[in-house]
Amino acid sequence: MTNVITRFAPSPTGFLHIGSARTALFNYLFARHHNGKFLLRIEDTDKERSTKEAVEAIFSGLKWLGLDWDGEVIFQSKRNNLYKEAALRLLQEGKAYYCFTSQEEIERQRQKALENKQHFIFNSEWRDKDSSTYPTDIKPVIRLKVPREGSITIHDTLQGDVVIENSHIDDMVLLRADGTATYMLAVVVDDHDMGITHIIRGDDHLTNAARQIAIYHAFGYEVPSMTHIPLIHGADGAKLSKRHGALGVEAYKDMGYLPESLCNYLLRLGWSHGDDEIISMTQAIEWFNLDSLGKSPSKLDFAKMNSLNAHYLRMLDNDSLTSKTVEILKQNYKISEKEVSYIKQAMPSLLVRSETLLDLAKLARIYLINSPIIYEQEAKEIIENCDKDLIKQVIEGLNKIEQFDKESVQNKFKEIATHNGLKLNDIMKPVRALITGMTASPSVFEIAEILGKENILKRLKII
C-alpha cells in the first residue's frame, strides 16, 4: 500500500463528540497500522459557530485518549486564499461559473417544486451566459458546473459502490459572494493539498461524497479511498442524542472512565477481531483493518462500558489508583498525607466495589478524617431511628479494645450482638451509617482497623 495519510477533521462548534472520537480513533489506528500519518484539520470556516474553547476541547480530548497527530494542525480559517485561487482556476477552465441568482429566487423555485411534489435541483440561468450580460451591482457566487449527463460512483470500501446520477447533483456553490469558501470546496482542496489517501468518516457524510467527488473530477485530482462508517446509536436504536447520556469525551473523563478503557470500548463499537473484547492500543494498531468494520449501527451500552472500565482499573497498580482517586477528591477537598495513606491502604477493598474512578473517589471519602461525612438520605433515616443505647454500648465496647485490628473489632461486635440477643447485621447497619454515611460500603471492620480507634469513636459519638 502507498504511504497512508488519514485525517480527522472536526468542526469546533462544541465538545469532542463520542462519535467523532471513534472516527478519530479509526483514522489513527489505520494510519499507525500502515506506518502512515494521522493529520488533524480544524474545519472552522463557520466563524459564528466556531469557538476557541471548542478547539481546545478537541485538542485536550484527543490528547487524553492518546491519539497524537502528526505535524502542524491545519486551520481552514487561515487558508481562504488557497480556496479562492482554486475556485478561480475552475472558473478560468470553464468548469465553474458566476451565478447572480438571489437566495429569494432560489427559495421561490424550491417552494414551487415542493408544491408540485417534485425533487428540487437548482438550475441556474447563469450557467452558460456570456460575461457581457453580467450585472455590475450584484456580487456573484461561484458555482461548480456539474456535467448534465452521466453519473458519479462512490467506491466505498464498506458500503460498496454507490451510484449517483449527475442529474441529481446541483451546481453547488464553491465560493460565496463575500469571497469565502464553502465546506465542499475547502474539504476537497485541503484533502488534496494534505495528500490524504484514505477518508474514514461517519456515513452521514455519504450524501456529501458524490458532490465532493464531482469537485475532485473538476480539478482532475485523484479521489482518496472512502470508508463511511455507521453512526453510534443509543440503547433504544435511535440516533445518539443528549437523552441517551453523555455525548462529549470530556464528560466521560469527568465520570471516571480511563482513556485506555474508552478507546477499547469505542474500537469495539463497529469493529471486531474475532471474539477479543480486551484489546490494548498496541494490539489495536497491529490488528486494525477496514475489512473488519461492521455495516450496522452500534448501540451505546453503558453496562458494557462500565464492565470494561472495571477491568482496566484492576490492571493499574495501587499507587496509580490512589493517585488518580486523590486527584479527583482534591477537586472538592483538601487532602492530608495521612488521608492519602488511609486510601492507599484501603484501595484493594475499594476497587472490588468500583467500576469507575468516580466510584473509587466516592468510597474513598470514608477515609477523609478532616472533612465532614456526607450522609446518604437512607443512612440519615437509619441513624435517626436506631437504638441510641445500643450505639453507646458499641462505643464503650470499642473503647476497651487495646489492639484495634479488624479481628478484635469484629469479635467485639459479635459479643455485643449476643449480649443483646441481636443478629450482627442489626448492629452493623446503624454503625455503618454512622461511620461511612452510606448503607453499602467496604467492611466496617477493615475501615475501623485503617482509621483507628480515635477516628471511629469520634464518628460514633455524633449521635
Curated annotation (Swiss-Prot):
It catalyses: tRNA(Glu) + L-glutamate + ATP = L-glutamyl-tRNA(Glu) + AMP + diphosphate. One of its GO terms (cellular component) is cytosol. InterPro entries: aa-tRNA-synth_I_cd-bd, aa-tRNA-synth_I_codon-bd_sub2, aa_tRNA-synth_I_cd-bd_sf, Glu-tRNA-ligase_bac/mito, Glu/Gln-tRNA-synth, Glu/Gln-tRNA-synth_Ib_cat-dom, GluQ/Sye, GluRS_core. A motif ('HIGH' region) lies at residues 10-20. Its EC number is 6.1.1.17. GO terms for biological process: glutamyl-tRNA aminoacylation. It is found in: Cytoplasm. Its main location: cytoplasm. Gene3D superfamilies: 1.10.10.350, HUPs. Keywords: Aminoacyl-tRNA synthetase, ATP-binding, Cytoplasm, Ligase, Nucleotide-binding, Protein biosynthesis. Belongs to the class-I aminoacyl-tRNA synthetase family. Glutamate--tRNA ligase type 1 subfamily. PANTHER family: GLUTAMATE--TRNA LIGASE, GLUTAMATE--TRNA LIGASE, MITOCHONDRIAL-RELATED. Monomer. Catalyzes the attachment of glutamate to tRNA(Glu) in a two-step reaction: glutamate is first activated by ATP to form Glu-AMP and then transferred to the acceptor end of tRNA(Glu). This is Glutamate--tRNA ligase 2. The gene is gltX2.
